């Protein structure tokens, strides 16, 4: 059994080492690891940060991305009022019908509706974005290796605000390998995107929006806030799950102590 465990640990170490090396070879840089508020057994989401993150998504990201797995009514968990949620939902039009004449029509959104894509379909989305349809963001924080750290790094990883301008480290790397230094003039260079050529322009810049709570809207602040919101969208039950886990651990601890005390009481007068 000991030998099996040792072999498993060695294999796991090799996998991690290979994975790290592959990431370094492809990206040239490591992910920016952030101290997220929800990490650790006692970590929890920061509700004001989630509200700011939704504001970034709503005012910036939603022009290209949808969140089909998040209903407007779910935003009540972020502290939004019922009236505020109704107002947000009503900003969007949803297909409905047919009417009495058999014609389809549109209606204002309701809290039961899910946050839609701004495009009618994937082909329309791809046509409007250089051939690549922007992904739905509902589960992005769980779907990408590195999760929130990857998304944050991606948002911060643009080499230039202009397309066709690769990072200096990449140019040097190509030259050292004797390869042609050629980069797609229509793409933006990103340290963390696979292949480094991304169609999405840098989405964030300082003071792009005005936070409703008065927080300074720096690029870094907006990146952290929207990543927090995306992680909540992917794991909205995280706080409840951790609270339940702590209660279970507390219960098991008390139960163990009671059983131990009971055992000692039963066997106290028994001679061994």
UniProtKB/Swiss-Prot annotation:
InterPro entries: Cyt_c-like_dom, Cyt_c-like_dom_sf, Cyt_c1. GO terms for molecular function: electron transfer activity; heme binding; metal ion binding. Heme c binds at residues 61, 64-65, 200. Pfam families: Cytochrom_C1. Residues 1-24 form the signal peptide. One of its GO terms (cellular component) is plasma membrane. The keyword Glycoprotein does not apply. The chain crosses the membrane at residues 244-261. Binds 1 heme c group covalently per subunit. Keywords: Cell membrane, Electron transport, Heme, Iron, Membrane, Metal-binding, Respiratory chain, Signal, Transmembrane, Transmembrane helix, Transport. Its main location: membrane. It is a single-pass membrane protein. It is found in: Cell membrane. Component of the ubiquinol-cytochrome c reductase complex (complex III or cytochrome b-c1 complex), which is a respiratory chain that generates an electrochemical potential coupled to ATP synthesis. The main subunits of complex b-c1 are: cytochrome b, cytochrome c1 and the Rieske protein. This is Cytochrome c1. It comes from Rhodospirillum rubrum. The lineage of its organism: Bacteria, Pseudomonadati, Pseudomonadota, Alphaproteobacteria, Rhodospirillales.
């Amino acid at each position: 059994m000991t030998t099996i465990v040792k072999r498993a640990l060695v294999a796991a170490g090799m996998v991690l080492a290979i994975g790290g090396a592959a990431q370094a070879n492809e990206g040239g840089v490591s992910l920016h690891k952030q101290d997220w508020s929800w990490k650790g057994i006692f970590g929890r989401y920061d509700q004001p940060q989630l509200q700011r993150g939704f504001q970034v998504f709503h005012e910036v990201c939603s022009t290209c991305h949808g969140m089909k797995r998040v209903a407007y009514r779910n935003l009540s968990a972020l502290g939004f009022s019922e009236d505020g949620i109704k107002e947000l939902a009503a900003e969007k039009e949803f297909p409905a019908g047919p009417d009495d004449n058999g014609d389809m029509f549109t209606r204002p959104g309701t809290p039961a509706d899910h946050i839609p894509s701004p495009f009618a379909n994937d082909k329309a989305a791809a046509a409007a974005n250089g051939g690549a349809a922007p992904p739905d963001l509902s589960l992005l924080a769980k779907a990408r290796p590195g999760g929130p750290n990857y998304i944050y790094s991606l948002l911060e990883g643009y080499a230039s605000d202009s397309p066709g301008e690769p990072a200096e480290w990449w140019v040097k790397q190509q030259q050292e390998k004797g390869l042609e230094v050629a980069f797609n003039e229509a793409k933006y260079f990103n340290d963390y995107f696979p292949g480094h050529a991304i169609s999405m322009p840098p989405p964030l810049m300082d003071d792009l929006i005005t936070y409703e709570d008065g927080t300074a809207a720096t690029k870094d602040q907006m990146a952290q806030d929207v990543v927090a919101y995306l992680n909540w969208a992917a794991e909205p039950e995280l706080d409840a799950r951790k609270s339940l886990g702590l209660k279970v651990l507390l219960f098991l601890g008390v139960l163990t102590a009671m059983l131990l005390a009971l055992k000692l009481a039963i066997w106290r007068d028994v001679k061994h």
